[in-house]
């Protein structure tokens, strides 16, 4: 089925292009979301008359998305979940969980704007794309941990913390403090 794209669609094409897609994709996604029109003579003529208005609307939406992207900066969200000793979660973190965590930080995004290929099933730090507009996206860091304390440790170390007891953590902190002190005197 041939359709006329009314906005940029990732991995498909730019606004105004006539592209061939599978009928189910057109009927179930592109047409209901008003991202495309069927490529008929009447719709081609309609698109040409409305092209300037559509481009202006697209530009306005893009500017709004860029402002939101600028305000998001380096956002990081913490999601606490129960897990086994190896770091495997007893469930998963989905796009809905990430959208809810962003909503707690007063950032409103829909779950369909959170672009993760597969649900997150382990503890750790994960980069996640938030698609604010077909041409504007922001990458945030999702910190999945067992507790808030563990989330802080993961953020400091830049990775998953597994099986550390409090005594081990204190010893590591003391060791790094002495190493840093030794480097300063040598310099």
Curated annotation (Swiss-Prot):
The organism's place on the tree of life at top rank: Bacteria
| Keywords associated with the record | Ribonucleoprotein, Ribosomal protein, RNA-binding, rRNA-binding
Q: Name one GO biological process term.
A: translation
Q: Name one Pfam family in it.
A: Ribosomal_L9_N
Sorted alphabetically, which InterPro entries does this protein's record hold? Ribosomal_bL9 (IPR000244), Ribosomal_bL9/RNase_H1_N (IPR009027), Ribosomal_bL9_bac/chp (IPR020594), Ribosomal_bL9_C (IPR020069), Ribosomal_bL9_C_sf (IPR036791), Ribosomal_bL9_N (IPR020070), Ribosomal_bL9_N_sf (IPR036935)
A Gene Ontology term for the protein's cellular component: ribonucleoprotein complex
> Which residues does the annotated region (Disordered) include?
155-187
Alphabetized PROSITE patterns for the sequence: RIBOSOMAL_L9
Segments of skewed composition (Acidic residues): 166-187
Give GO terms: molecular function aspect only: rRNA binding; structural constituent of ribosome
Similarity comment: family membership: Belongs to the bacterial ribosomal protein bL9 family.
What role does this protein play? Answer: Binds to the 23S rRNA.
PANTHER family, per the entry: 50S RIBOSOMAL PROTEIN L9
Name assigned to this protein: Large ribosomal subunit protein bL9
According to its UniProt entry, this protein's organism is Rhodospirillum centenum (strain ATCC 51521 / SW)
Phylogenetic placement of the source organism: Bacteria, Pseudomonadati, Pseudomonadota, Alphaproteobacteria, Rhodospirillales
């Amino acid at each position: 089925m041939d359709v006329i794209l009314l906005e940029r669609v990732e991995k498909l094409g730019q606004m105004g292009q006539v592209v061939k897609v599978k009928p189910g994709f057109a009927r179930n996604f592109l047409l209901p979301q008003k991202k495309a029109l069927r490529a008929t003579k009447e719709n081609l003529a309609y698109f040409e008359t409305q092209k300037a208005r559509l481009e202006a609307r697209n530009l306005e939406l893009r500017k709004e998305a860029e402002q939101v992207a600028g305000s998001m900066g380096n956002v990081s969200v913490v999601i606490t979940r129960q897990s086994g000793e190896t770091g495997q979660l007893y469930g998963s973190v989905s796009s809905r969980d990430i959208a809810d965590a962003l909503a707690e930080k007063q950032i409103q995004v829909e779950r369909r704007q959170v672009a993760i290929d597969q649900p997150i099933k382990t503890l750790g730090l994960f980069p996640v794309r938030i698609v604010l507009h077909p041409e504007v996206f922001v990458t945030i860091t999702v910190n999945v941990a067992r507790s808030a304390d563990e989330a802080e440790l993961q953020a400091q170390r830049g990775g998953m913390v597994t099986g550390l007891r409090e005594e081990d953590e204190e010893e590591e902190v003391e060791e790094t403090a002495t190493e840093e002190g030794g480097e300063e005197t040598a310099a």
